[in-house]
């Protein structure tokens, strides 16, 4: 089981990203627009740098919904391989059966 603080920090980052997404996208569009003067683009760059770092989408870590584990994460199922195996063996995940041949 992952530390509760790490899971909560990641949740807080997700909300920050959601709140800052439109503002960051607007500033990035200004920065990338070659038609605008360099001074205006530089000011937008400074504003973007002053926004909270946790507002960046790359700061989010995919974590298992069951255990909070950050590694070996299956995006489709939103859980780690260990939680998938445990729940699959119990028959809690539809369509997952232990293979035998």
Swiss-Prot record:
Keyword Ribosomal protein in annotation: yes
Origin superkingdom: Bacteria
InterPro entries xrefs: Ribosomal_uS14, Ribosomal_uS14_bac/plastid, Ribosomal_uS14_CS
This protein's UniProt keywords: Ribonucleoprotein, Ribosomal protein, RNA-binding, rRNA-binding
SUPFAM superfamilies membership: Glucocorticoid receptor-like (DNA-binding domain)
GO CC annotations on file: cytoplasm; small ribosomal subunit
GO MF: rRNA binding; structural constituent of ribosome
Swiss-Prot/TrEMBL GO biological process terms: translation
Entries under HAMAP family matching the protein: Ribosomal_uS14_1
Family assignment from sequence similarity: Belongs to the universal ribosomal protein uS14 family.
Entry function: Binds 16S rRNA, required for the assembly of 30S particles and may also be responsible for determining the conformation of the 16S rRNA at the A site.
Subunit field text: Part of the 30S ribosomal subunit. Contacts proteins S3 and S10.
PANTHER family given in the database record: 30S RIBOSOMAL PROTEIN S14, SMALL RIBOSOMAL SUBUNIT PROTEIN US14M
Name under which the protein is recorded: Small ribosomal subunit protein uS14
Protein species of origin: Rhizobium johnstonii (strain DSM 114642 / LMG 32736 / 3841) (Rhizobium leguminosarum bv. viciae)
